[in-house]
Swiss-Prot record:
The gene is moaA. This is GTP 3',8-cyclase. Binds 2 [4Fe-4S] clusters. Binds 1 [4Fe-4S] cluster coordinated with 3 cysteines and an exchangeable S-adenosyl-L-methionine and 1 [4Fe-4S] cluster coordinated with 3 cysteines and the GTP-derived substrate. Residues 24-248 form the Radical SAM core domain. Its cofactor is [4Fe-4S] cluster.
Length: 348
């Protein structure tokens, strides 16, 4: 990678020596997750209602504005950007933003990646790789096509498999993400593990999070991953390893397959003490914590002037409000989410 300094449009100068932002608890903020759209071509039962009301398209930042915002964060020490949604690849002309951000790799940005449901991968995989994307996360909760249809409501299992094939053929490494749902897919996790490891992919299992109103009762879906790990250890030898990808997963090595298995446990063993990330929505709202409602409006600063001084000041002020941890709780006595906004707005 080169270490040149450059400026793109009115965006902030990009430099590899930018010092990371430090929050009130001494954590360096080096990771930006950008939800480029709240729209999705699936309606996963744990994520959103089937008849979702999405943001008016006129409220979304333009791709050029998202590029400028990302550039400001890179100038302030962010070295990893993940594009999320909704489903990021359904955003019109999204590859424009991917190309612009990919051009910043080596100029302050170390890695550009994305989380996807895989539905659009078959047509975008080669170009994603050409733009510098080397790793992606694909959400896949089951290998049973009928159950896949049930949980996604609108999803096409074969299309996702084609997308995984295309991404691997293009040279992109894949990590599968599976949300563990009690009495739905918990018995399938061993098969998902064998499938992933058999194809050279990591697997991460995730506890369901209480975000947004859905038709399902999350207390019925919730499965502590400590229970899942105990079940897996009846079949596999799991050894804790010191492996980090910049995210919250804690990894083990599976002796029988040789592959890695990650656990993301926001409910039973939160990852707040090492949190290095903030989340930007497609409307320019910055959430300093996934599980808190406090937010900063960066759109106003972005549009106030072509100079980035005001934007940088707004980002700095927001980081001073990054909390120590989230407020997630699964509580059957209060049948409401801990955070009202849906994951598709915040970016999962």
């Amino acid at each position: 990678m080169n270490n040149r300094v450059g400026t793109i449009g009115n965006a902030s100068p990009l430099t590899a020596d930018a010092h990371p932002m430090i929050d009130p608890f001494g954590r360096a903020v080096t990771y930006l997750r950008v939800s480029v759209t709240d729209r999705c071509d699936f309606r996963c039962t744990y994520c959103m209602a089937e008849n979702m009301t999405f943001l008016p398209k006129k409220d979304l930042l333009t791709l050029e504005e998202l590029d400028r915002l990302c550039s400001a964060f890179i100038a302030k020490g962010v070295s990893k950007i993940r594009l999320t949604g909704g489903e990021p690849l359904v955003r019109k002309n999204i590859m424009y933003l991917v190309r612009k951000l990919g051009a910043k790799i080596g100029s302050g940005l170390d890695e550009l990646t994305l989380t996807t449901n895989g539905s659009q991968l078959s047509r975008h995989a080669a170009e994603l790789h050409d733009c510098g994307v080397r790793r992606i996360n694909v959400s896949l909760d089951t290998l049973d096509p009928d159950k896949f249809r049930k949980i996604t409501r609108w999803g096409d299992f074969d299309k996702v498999m084609e997308g995984i094939d295309a991404a691997q053929k293009a040279g992109i490494k894949i990590k599968l993400n599976a949300v563990a749902l009690k009495n739905f897919n918990d018995a399938e996790i061993p098969d998902l593990l064998r499938f992933a490891h058999g194809r050279g992919m990591d697997l991460t299992v995730i506890e369901t999070m209480p975000m947004g109103e859905i038709e399902e009762d999350r207390t019925d879906q919730y499965l502590p991953l400590s229970e899942l790990r105990a079940d897996l250890e009846r079949q596999f030898t799991l050894t804790d390893i010191d492996y980090q990808t910049g995210g919250p997963a804690r990894y083990v090595r599976v002796s029988e397959t040789g592959g890695r298995l990650g656990f993301i446990t926001p409910m039973t063993h939160n990852f707040c003490e090492s949190c290095n990330r903030v989340r930007l929505t497609c409307t320019g709202t910055l959430y300093m914590c996934l599980g808190q409602n406090d937010a900063a409006d960066l759109r106003a600063a972005l549009r106030a002037t072509e100079d980035d001084a005001l934007l940088h000041a707004a980002i700095d002020e927001a980081i001073t409000r990054k909390p120590k941890g989230h407020d997630f709780i699964i509580d059957r006595t209060h049948n409401r989410p801990a955070v009202a906004r849906h994951m598709s707005v915040t970016g999962g």
